[in-house]
Amino acid sequence: MASLIYRQLLTNSYTVELSDEIQEIGSTKSQSVTINPGPFAQTSYAPVNWGPGETNDSTVVEPVLDGPYQPTTFNPPVSYWMLLTPTDAGVEVEGTNNTNRWLATILIEPNVQSEERTYTLFGQQVQITVSNDSQTKWKLVDVSKQTQDGNFSQHRQLLSTPKLYGVMKHGGKIYTYNGETPNANTGYYSTTNYDSVNMTAYCDFYIIPLAQEAKCTEYINNGLPPIQNTRNVVPVSISSRSIVHTRAKANEDIIVSKTSLWKEMQYNRDIIIRFKFANSIVKSGGLGYKWSEVSFKPANYQYTYTRDGEEVTAHTTCSVNGVNDFNYNGGSLPTDFVISKYEVIKENSCVYIDYWDDSKAFRNMVYVRSLAANLNSVMCPGGDYSFALPVGNYPVMTGGAVSLHSAGVTLSTQFTDFVSLNSLRFRFRLSVEEPSFSIMRTRVSGLYGLPAAKPNNSQEYYEIAGRFSLISLVPSNDDYQTPIMNSVTVRQDLERQLGELRDEFNNLSQQIAMSQLIDLALLPLDMFSMFSGIKSTIDAAKSMATNVMKKFKKSNLANSVSTLTDSLSDAASSVSRSSSVRSLGSTASAWTEVSEVATEVNELTNSISTQTSTISKRLRLKEMATQTDGMNFDDISAAVLKTKIDKSTQINANTLPDIVTEASEKFIPNRTYRVIADDEVLEASTDGRFFAYKVETFEEVPFDVQKFADLVTDSPVISAIIDFKTLKNLNDNYGINKQQALNLLRSDPKVLREFINQNNPIIRNRIENLIMQCRL
């Protein structure tokens, strides 16, 4: 039997020659090279003196409320509100373009009957009739004239409790506030040469950018924050600030502090992040109507763009976390459309984008502080993916969308095909968007999120613009470079080879002929015949077998043997013959970890499904200990492994040990085992399903957990190559006699080959499904 290879590995993996150990130690010593660039790297700590810390820079961040400033005459910048804070009645502000607009604002106290008052406007004494009927609110009145010798007339008015007023030059107009607080709004006066209008303020004032107009309106209606109304806030001259807003440069390298050996550099960079999603769509075996998986996987993308006249080469890796698993089952027939699992990212998911470029900011990224980033959001809509069926209309997964919003940035290491890069990892939170997604020609519709079927929607990439800033500790001499503290490039190169080999192995599943597979599964494969397909010398094959045994020694299968060996000797005596469910705990101890039994044995709430699943996970070793003439799952697993090794073009001495060990653990994860007692069969799977039925009629009977536990201890355990559902389907559609049923129950390879040679679709579909489960 092909599974002999696993038993040989279990037996021989504990014997390692001393010379091999010495060689391995010597190899490890020679490959672990430590580079000592100085005392800081040697101790793995940064220098104690980090410099002055954060440096304030008022040219980058614009304040919302700038001031207060003393009364003055000046030309305010365009698109900035002057928020006036008068204290006494009278003229508060005036401005003119000296051509066709003279505009001033007068403050009138509450409860003033109509009377004539004298005001000084633009250097002249003017008589104006004013009034304020409100008992509590102050009144601000705009007065205007269009010629130098004309008369002033009253225009818009504002009744205000906070006693605040605003005026702004913008878009060929002069804007002011009017109405009544707390519902005041803006109005305007058209003015030529508006940008040259000088304003004279007779009270303290603040300056607020147009982008914060909503905040200015809030102050007009409700008053300034309390902190602005204390004696600690002292107005200063307008000359103390520069109104001109200086934009940050796309590339900024600023020396924060410097000593003889080290300096702190602040790197500010405008960046363009381009990324794409990758996916994996795996079709199940059978007649072509079923898919086992539609999932996301990490995607690398390399590109160039221009920043401040300089061409930048960048590399990104996009990955997702917190995916949601969905499935669709159109029925139990072989021709029913089924997707066992398809992944969707939603609000509870995260998207990570690792970014690197070839600028100085990424050269010495060992000690970093003050890392910050500001990125735009981006919407990612899903496309249409058609599931090609052999016959009939294709189901189409269509729609779905999410938006990515920046949620933070950290340091990371990004692995390309050949080198590891110090990178920035940008984390994005998600929000679902319209439209919803659906699977056309099925009942799946109205679901939200982005499915993995076609996440890029025929676009080459998505793009996000933004900026990051960090302070990095680097050598004062720019010719020096600090090394990566723990280099993992060699291991990552092996991981890359393993990743490519896994992909190749998984793609080879559809090229395996089932009749040849069964013949190969019946051969007593040993290590030499297993690896004979690899083009190498005998010495290399011997070394390869030794490396495989060393790796296999640490596998989950090998680790389970010692635990099982200790408990098997006590299994029979520890079984209680009581019919209660609780008594199963002592029997299960032979097939479960001791720690699991200790927590489960006293829990009456354990369901039958949980108990059978716990036992069935350990039945693989029980089956190995009581080998039968029937075919088992490990025979198929080893035969598939042998076939793929022979077909592979990328297998080598470095990757083979990992592949063999992974295959022993991951091939055929969903296994079903059975025991036979007279005319009754008890069957349990690793996912918790269980059946009990009669051999002749396939009629289900109640599942007796205690009986199953007893039979597991005393009787041979058989791999259910053809499980109960397949047997029942075969009997219902074709009809089988008792002898055929018994042969299939015992997994007789001759009978299996006969059904496959007859091209029986039900048996072929089951075997193909097992082959497709042989994935890494």
From Swiss-Prot:
Note the site residues: Binding to sialic acid.
R101, S190
Listed GO CC annotations: host cell endoplasmic reticulum-Golgi intermediate compartment; host cell plasma membrane; host cell rough endoplasmic reticulum; host cytoskeleton; membrane; viral outer capsid
Q: Where is this site: Cleavage?
A: R231, N232, R241, S242, R247, A248
Task: Map motif YGL motif onto the chain.
Answer: 448-450
- List the Pfam families: Rota_VP4_MID, VP4_haemagglut, VP4_helical
Span of the annotated motif KID motif: 644-646
Q: Which keywords does UniProt give here?
A: Capsid protein, Coiled coil, Disulfide bond, Hemagglutinin, Host cell membrane, Host cytoplasm, Host cytoskeleton, Host endoplasmic reticulum, Host membrane, Host-virus interaction, Membrane, Outer capsid protein, Viral attachment to host cell, Viral penetration into host cytoplasm, Viral penetration via permeabilization of host membrane, Virion, Virus entry into host cell
Map out region (Spike body and stalk (antigen domain)) in residue numbers: 248-479
Task: Outline the segment boundaries, as ranges, of region: Spike foot.
Answer: 510-776
Taking the record's annotation, the residue ranges forming a coiled coil are 484-518
Q: Which cysteines are joined by disulfide bonds?
A: C203-C216, C318-C380
Q: Where are the residues of the annotated region Hydrophobic?
A: 389-409
Instruction: Locate the region Spike head.
Output: 65-224
Q: Which SUPFAM superfamilies match?
A: Concanavalin A-like lectins/glucanases, VP4 membrane interaction domain
Could you name the domain of life of the organism this protein comes from? Viruses
GO BP term (any one): virion attachment to host cell
Similarity section: Belongs to the rotavirus VP4 family.
| Other comments on record | In group A rotaviruses, VP4 defines the P serotype. Some rotavirus strains are neuraminidase-sensitive and require sialic acid to attach to the cell surface. Some rotavirus strains are integrin-dependent. Some rotavirus strains depend on ganglioside for their entry into the host cell. Hsp70 also seems to be involved in the entry of some strains.
Name the record gives this protein: Outer capsid protein VP4
Q: Record the organism.
A: Rotavirus A (isolate RVA/Cow/Thailand/A5/1988/G8P6[1]) (RV-A)
